[in-house]
A protein has these predicted regions:
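Active-site-adjacent alpha-helix immediately C-terminal to a catalytic or transition-state-stabilizing loop
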Residues: 53-54, 153-202
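Short, conserved phosphate/pyrophosphate- and ester-handling motifs at nucleotide-, phospho-/glycolipid
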Residues: 27, 66, 171
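Unchanged
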Residues: 1-34
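Short, surface-exposed amphipathic charged segments that create phosphate/polyanion-binding patches used
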Residues: 144-151
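Non-catalytic terminal regions of proteins
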Residues: 131, 152-153
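Short, structured interface segments
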Residues: 26-55
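Active-site-proximal alpha-helix that buttresses catalytic centers in soluble enzyme cores
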Residues: 41, 50-52, 56-144, 176, ...
Length: 202
């Protein structure tokens, strides 16, 4: 896995040994006492929160919104062929490295061009094929939001069965609809609040 995602992940620079006194395993309570910087204590607190929410037993499904696309008003072709802009391509390049941190082993995308272009580089660099899902297009979602959810839910179940990460690239309206269903699956109200209720701009 590490070899496959090396190009997407980018170079990893070793820490300056002069900044490391020693490496040791300690309890959370002990680590909290040892940390002298407030930012480090904040990171530890976030880690503890995630563990208490069950993150160690969880699997990763990454929701990706396509990069900045050509404005609808300026595009003369059909909406499914509207490409990402140079800014969108830059966003896709940056996103590539972010996604590689999670080591997805399955890539799903709306077949519309802007979604495919956003996640295509990760596919090229890892050798993973792109699987297109017609129900996740904007038009398909507008016509049948339940079919879009069923398509996404199938990928969610596959991810849980395989115990490996999946990345799904789609459109803002579709993500908003998916969030509505995901809120119903949340085990706690605090977890539910993390899924914003308005249409997400990501």
């Amino acid at each position: 896995d590490a070899v496959r995602r090396a190009d997407a992940f980018g170079p990893v620079h070793r820490a300056d040994v002069g900044e490391i006194d020693s490496v040791m395993w300690v309890s959370v309570q002990c680590a909290r006492r040892m940390l002298t910087h407030s930012t480090d204590r904040d990171i530890l607190a976030l880690f503890v929160d995630r563990v208490e929410e069950g993150a160690l037993d969880g699997d990763m499904l990454l929701l990706v919104r396509h990069g900045k696309a050509e404005p609808r008003k300026q595009w003369t072709g059909t909406d499914d062929k509207r490409p990402i802009t140079p800014r969108g391509a830059s966003m896709a390049y940056s996103l590539d490295r972010e996604l590689a941190c999670y080591n997805p082993t399955r890539l799903i995308t709306s077949p519309w061009l802007r979604c495919q272009q956003t996640i295509q580089m990760l596919s090229w660099q890892t050798g993973l094929p792109l699987h297109t899902a017609e129900p996740l297009t904007e038009d398909a979602f507008a016509a049948d939001p339940e079919a879009a959810w069923q398509c996404f839910h199938k990928e969610l179940k596959n991810t849980l069965q395989r115990h490996s990460a999946t990345a799904v690239c789609m459109h803002r309206p579709v993500i908003g609809g998916i969030f509505g269903h995901l809120r119903e699956l949340c085990a706690t109200k605090s977890l539910m609040k993390r899924l914003i209720s308005s249409s997400p701009y990501m």
